[in-house]
Amino acid sequence: MDYKKIHIPVMVKEVIQLLNPYGGIYVDATLGCGGHSLAILKRLSPDGRLIGIDRDESAIFYANRILDDSRVILRKASFSHLKEVLSELNIEKIDGIIFDLGVSMLQLKDFERGFSFHSEERLDMRMDQTEPLTAWDVVNKYPEQKLTQIFRDYGDEPFARRIAREIIRQRGKKTIDTCKELADLVKKTVPRHGRLHPATQIFQAIRIEVNREFEELRQGLLQAVELLNSGGRICVISYHSGEDRVVKNFFREEEQKGNLRILTKKPLLPSLEEVAKNPSARSARLRGGEKI
């Protein structure tokens, strides 16, 4: 797979303006293919350091191709292990950190990973392939009530109960094995509005459940603020209301505690020019804060 053809980092200019990297230690907590890391490196001083972290082994592999620099260290880990990873590197404090949330294009374009509507591969959606829970388990083993709750809480899906009932009915005949089977089931069950595929929010909800994304995000944000030096900055890009709500509430709580100064009273949005070049950026929301 040629990552250069599929990966366009989102809101790079705005992230760099907020982080304002130069000297010190910076962390890209969602390495992906290394787009944001590369932009940070271009601004980083010769004695600066950049730590790239991702729970996806393939992200580490691809990022290694473009981040061949003595200032860079890459590690496979989830948000909740942020402090542990840095401790192993004898790093107690950092000067900036970026979180670019959600699924990466690298994962979406790899049909074998089971993230795409069109994939004929088995339902998977694990960002970390060593984790036991898969999308297949959620779809074929969870009871109706739990499916409904996940679809509502993580996907803001108005037809959550109807879709959950149809999944239960269908799997009574045969297991739902592939992403395409699930996408087709949802498409037949609910009306389509606009250009968005009707299964978009369902896939999002299942992915969040499989990867414990909200729990990991809260842990990552907590550890990040603890690790920041005074004046250090945190940037978070989210792509749907649930993620953004977690980030917004966390920033407010930390501001009330006197730990953080919010730099973005309202989230920054991608420019019309960026969205035209990279449609996947259209739902991005960027929030930033500075450690007090």
Swiss-Prot record:
PANTHER family: 12S RRNA N4-METHYLCYTIDINE METHYLTRANSFERASE, S-ADENOSYL-METHYLTRANSFERASE MRAW. Its EC number is 2.1.1.199. GO terms for biological process: rRNA base methylation. Specifically methylates the N4 position of cytidine in position 1402 (C1402) of 16S rRNA. S-adenosyl-L-methionine binds at residues 34-36, 54, 81, 100, 107. InterPro entries: RsmH, SAM-dep_MeTrfase_MraW_recog, SAM-dependent_MTases_sf. Belongs to the methyltransferase superfamily. RsmH family. Coiled coil: none annotated. This is Ribosomal RNA small subunit methyltransferase H. The keyword S-adenosyl-L-methionine applies. Pfam families: Methyltransf_5. SUPFAM superfamilies: Putative methyltransferase TM0872, insert domain, S-adenosyl-L-methionine-dependent methyltransferases. It catalyses: cytidine(1402) in 16S rRNA + S-adenosyl-L-methionine = N(4)-methylcytidine(1402) in 16S rRNA + S-adenosyl-L-homocysteine + H(+). It is an enzyme of class 2 (transferase). GO terms for cellular component: cytoplasm. It is found in: Cytoplasm.
